[in-house]
Amino acid sequence: ALFYNQIKMANDILNSIPDGTTDPTLLSYRGQAKAIRAFDYLNVAPYFQFKYKGNEEKPCIPLVTEEMAADPNNPRATVQAVYDLIIRDLTDAINDLEGYARKDKSEIDQKIAYGLRARANLYMENWQAAADDAAKAMAGYTPYQRAELTKPMFVSSDESGWMWALEITEADYNADNSLISWPGVIGSFCEGSYSAGVGMYKSINVLLFNLISDTDVRKGWWVDENLHSDNLKGQSWRCLASGDDIATLTVANQGKAAFLPYTNVKFGMYGGLGTNAAANDWPLMRVEEMILILS
């Protein structure tokens, strides 16, 4: 429903903007609307048909644009037609967003539109076009450095490498609804949440853990069989425990269960470990993705 709701909102915005406008504000609205519509179709399409290459003429999803009147007889478009619209929307967005300076990372600017077109070209196996767009998208962004990843991170859009994000505030997720927040489900440090409160931690198994080299910084994103991770060094759970003692800490009334072996400690927590104001931002695009596409 999320993607279709956004498509509807994008179409409403596009219908409200006069053809041929040269107003910079309206151009930024039009560019962002087309980019988000492309983002939505790019996310929905793979659920309803196999990959682009070799399946171009197979049915995918119905397309609804601002130019179409409401019509219940709107059959599934081909994969080719869906991706044609995605590329066309993103190309239009790149043109409309020329020179646009966004207020924060929750908005789409020209580089994000390039990044989305890089994704689309990647899905279509247009390798060189994907690499070219990724290079334009990532200009000026710096990936995480190794030292930054030796502690729980991925909390704020201000962190290295975040290009586009949902910027969450305490008004969106706080102690009253942290149970259903993303750090409360995916992370391990939100007290009283679905994961920490009842011990439903996201983890890997020993086979995968052992495949990760000891020199790979990502190995610290999980505790080992002894509930140790170097990434817990210097960390504190509301002054109740620190370091590896965080793993065995329990807090009454479904506040925190002890970690199990291979529990993830990758994601930090807004306000510090053990808080339940779950206002962690949600990344939608990072520069590391563009580096991977480029390579």
Kindly give the residue locations of the regions a language model identified.
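Conserved, well-structured interaction surfaces
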Residues: 1-48, 77-80, 94-100, 274-282
